[in-house]
A protein has these predicted regions:
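Charged, low-complexity intrinsically disordered terminal segments
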Residues: 2-41, 115-511
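Transmembrane alpha-helices and immediately adjacent membrane-cytoplasm interface residues
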Residues: 46-117
């Protein structure tokens, strides 16, 4: 066993897992004790009523059909099923969270000329206008922007020098929100600049996911950073208590400088994302830099999760800055998605579906995981069947072998409809990007899997008629040139891989 795993087991995370296991055992023990205490007829009656109420709750709940099937399978497990659903099946907002949500929705970061922009877009394309209207109705943090210059980076290696340069230019505040941070060249270089900026009076706020960093940072790392002047906190901190909210991780990658410059994409703050450390071959990731009005939406997204996590913030207005418009063509919507009931709709899934359903020439997709529901599968198939050139790229070298088996299990249905599947042979492709018809693209953190589309807090940038779409197209062409196309007539999986795929597919909504 590695030192990292031993340290993890001996940390607060190991203790929390142990305590939650004890809590689960205690719940089962209490149930069996009550079963012994009551007469048999009463125990059976209670059991039947519990099963019926649990099944009715699952059937009537507003959730994806695949999730209902999974929970119904779990619910019929004697005793354990309804207890597991009671503990992990559905998250309800506390009164405090409801107040927070109302406060966030009341904040107005939207542009004064937003309506005029939408009407302008409506005149150009009613279909695109419909997509914009859909995104803005699902994510109240989002808005349509122009006056923004964008830069697409096909690799984290290429993004890193520019990111450091931008950090050095900060004058007022820096916001960072990431899923994974690990000490090394990338993070240490960033941290050195952040500490310099703190000395200059720049406000620095850092939010990272507790579970995402549990194997990379010590438990007291936020305290260490706060002593150095960085306002650092863990998102959805692990405590020894059973709760469904542990499933809702902060998978976002957001960096904002003075409300004027912003970054997002697939790259976390660890050395493999800039290929300074080799894991699973060459690490292929992408990012987008925004300069101008659209950064306001990234600022708002950060403040939203900061507020959800911390419960309060001193003054929203001081971050509501009039950022300078920059000469740049195109329209942009930085948007967020996340779990119910914080988000009422699956924003990321809806954005992907809109792009796929409206494509007329081609749709290109990269994703590290391909574990999607029936609706999204059919949308992709139907696009190919109507003559759209649909191509999907996944990794040849996986970071999770079992997940790759499920990913490959999705290939045959898609290929039968004419979808072209590629595997990135140089290594692990972690990019999450979609491009269609040289007109619209999405770059961000949203994988084509249930965790990203249903459970996690995610973010991305919708881009329409941006000059950078040509770079994204060139990046896809480069990816295709070094990837292997999977052919339906030669694609095979072993019997045990098929068995694993079939079993895991039942629990795909939890993967």
């Amino acid at each position: 066993m590695s030192f990292r795993k031993i340290r993890l087991l001996m940390s607060k995370y190991g203790f929390s897992i142990l305590f939650m296991g004890f809590e689960l055992w205690l719940s089962f023990a209490a149930f069996f004790w009550l079963n012994e205490w009551f007469p048999n007829w009463m125990s059976v009656t209670i059991m039947v009523l519990l099963y019926i109420s649990t099944i009715l709750a699952i059937v009537n709940r507003n959730m994806p059909p695949e999730s209902k099937v999974t929970w119904l399978l779990i619910a019929v497990i004697p005793v354990f099923g309804f207890l597991l659903y009671l503990m992990f099946g559905e998250r309800r907002l506390s009164k405090k969270e409801m107040v927070q949500l109302e406060n966030m929705e009341s904040m107005n970061f939207r542009e004064d000329n937003s309506r005029e922009l939408r009407l302008q877009l409506k005149e150009e394309s009613k279909a695109v206008y419909g997509v914009v209207k859909s995104i803005l109705s699902m994510d109240h943090n989002a808005d349509l922007y122009n006056g923004t210059a964008s830069t697409f980076f096909p690799l984290g290696d290429q993004m890193f020098p520019q990111l450091l340069e931008d950090l050095r230019s900060a004058k007022k505040f820096i916001f960072l929100e990431f899923y994974i941070i690990e000490e090394g060249l990338m993070w240490n270089s960033i941290l050195d600049i952040l500490l310099e900026k703190v000395k200059e009076g720049v406000e620095v706020k850092l939010l990272y996911d507790d579970i995402g960093c549990m194997a990379t940072l010590k438990g007291n790392y936020t305290k260490r950073l706060r002593k150095l002047g960085i306002d650092a906190h863990k998102f959805n901190k692990v405590v020894p208590r059973l709760t469904v909210s542990y499933n809702n991780r902060d998978h976002r990658k957001i960096l904002v400088i003075d409300g004027q410059i912003g970054y997002t994409g697939g790259a976390n703050l660890a050395d493999e994302y800039i290929n300074q450390r080799e894991r699973f071959g060459h690490w292929k990731d992408s990012a987008v830099r925004l300069d101008g009005r659209a950064v306001k939406a990234l600022t708002r997204l950060f403040l939203m999760n900061w507020y959800i996590n911390q419960g309060e913030i001193e003054d929203f207005d001081k971050y509501h800055m009039e950022n300078q418009a920059v000469d740049g063509e195109g329209f942009y919507i930085p948007f967020g998605s996340g779990p119910k009931p914080i988000y009422k709709s699956q924003v990321g899934k809806a954005v992907y579906q809109n792009i796929i359903n409206q494509a007329t020439d081609y749709v290109y997709i990269t994703t590290p995981y391909l574990i999607i529901d029936y609706d999204l599968t059919e949308d992709i198939r139907n696009a190919a069947l109507r003559g759209v050139d649909v191509r999907i790229v996944t990794p040849s070298i996986p970071d999770k072998k079992l997940i790759q088996i499920v990913t490959r299990g999705a290939y045959p249905d898609l290929m039968e409809a004419g979808v072209k599947i590629y595997e990135y042979t140089p290594g692990f492709i972690h990019s999450k990007q979609v491009l269609a018809d040289d007109e619209v693209a999405v770059v961000g953190t949203i994988n084509f899997d249930y965790r990203s589309l249903v459970h996690h807090y995610e973010n991305a940038v919708w881009m329409y008629r941006s000059p950078e779409l040509a770079k994204i197209r060139a990046d896809f062409e480069e990816i295709f040139s070094v990837s292997q196309q999977i052919k339906l007539d030669t694609f095979r999986i072993t019997w045990y891989q098929y068995l694993i795929k079939e079993i895991m597919q039942l629990f795909a909504p939890m993967l």
